[in-house]
Amino acid sequence: MATILLVATATPGHVNPMLVAARLLVGEGHRVLMLCGALFEKGIRQSGAEFVSFSSEVDFDYRALEQHFPERAELSGTAQMALALRRFFAAPIPVHDRKLRALIAEEGVDLLLVENGFYGVLPLLQQARSQRLPILMLGVNPISFSSPDAIFYGPRIAPELRHSLGDLPWLDEQTRRLQAEVQQSFDAALAEAGAPPLAAPFTDVMVTAPDAFLQLSCAGFEYERPELEGLIRHIGPLLPPGIALTPPPWWERLDGRPLVIVSQGTLANVDLGQLLIPAMQGLAGDEVQLLLTTGGRDPALLGPSIPANAIVTDHVPFELALPRAAVLVTNGGYGSVQAALAHGVPLVVAGTGEDKAEVATRVAWSGVGINLHSNEPTAEAVAAAVRKVVHKPRYRARARLLADEMGRLDARAAIREAVTRLLARAC
């Protein structure tokens, strides 16, 4: 069996699918190591993989990003994403590259399995495939590839609509400047690592340079882009294995009313007033049941006035709750959206930071939900969107179509096949 090194950016949305992959590969008999932040050591060891920590100077705590990057609190949307790309993703590349190369040499690594948000692999990807070990990429974010209207994480205008818009300018000057600054940051980090500058946008290299790219979604959630044909394979979401779960204490309080799950995820949840509180206030008098999760934060942060139709908890096991849900209200975390769609649950999405605007755009484009186009929607806006999704069957019908498409895919089998093929090619 082979020695396989997994690497993931140290945030839950990036790590969780990689833990499923780690458990899968350990079960296949491979020796599996996983390089990640120290916060995730326990989960990595529980998967059966050997844990290796990021170097301390680039091991950021995702729960306190404003402490690492104080200016983040003053930014939103594209500007916040640009800051994250420069400081959180690009700047650590030289340190990550040194760690990767040392591990590969010391541990005799045969294959590198990376999620597409870990840019520390770019120096290795700059090498010819014949001069490096095989690299398999897992897509845990919206597909990121340049286009005339792309803002870091892909087009916000469905490709089929572009022709009807004629020669209208796609991006404003400020956005173009941000993109140029981010690309320069990646080139500077690569130069520090001793690698040449990128010959294409950094997002494109992460798609074209790996030996294989597996996207954890279905084609129905992504725009049709002929230029990506043959580069990306959609394999469906990589959800945790089905196990018997002990229902949480609040489970017995669920009744027959439509269940509305509301989550700000585990990253953008410092201010619960962005989504949880507006949803709670806007739907307090509705004939629905609210299940509000603070994503690990103290539920007391929502205050003492909790409506009678609401349940507040710091964690919701999606695999248990989503089959009962009428709608998921979220700020657009890619993994949460894929989990909802796998269960045929429609969505209301309110995120604009990180890659969440791209997720929200795809939710609306694919017909599986409503994009609120705001990081801080009003109570009225959230309530109106939830009522529309709950009472208009077309959203659930579209979500069920994507669930059927996902049901025909097998992410685990696809990963096994890709790993076997790449290892055989390397021999």
Features from the language model and the residues they span:
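Short gly/pro/ser/thr-enriched loop/turn and capping motifs at secondary-structure boundaries
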Residues: 41-42, 58-62, 141-148, 356-358, ...
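Conserved nucleotide-sugar donor-binding subdomain of glycosyltransferases
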Residues: 67-123, 167-204, 208
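Conserved nucleotide-sugar phosphate-binding/catalytic loop shared by glycosyltransferases and other
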Residues: 33-81, 165-166
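Nucleotide-activated sugar donor-binding and catalytic core shared by glycosyltransferases
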Residues: 3-10, 18-33, 43-50, 103-106, ...
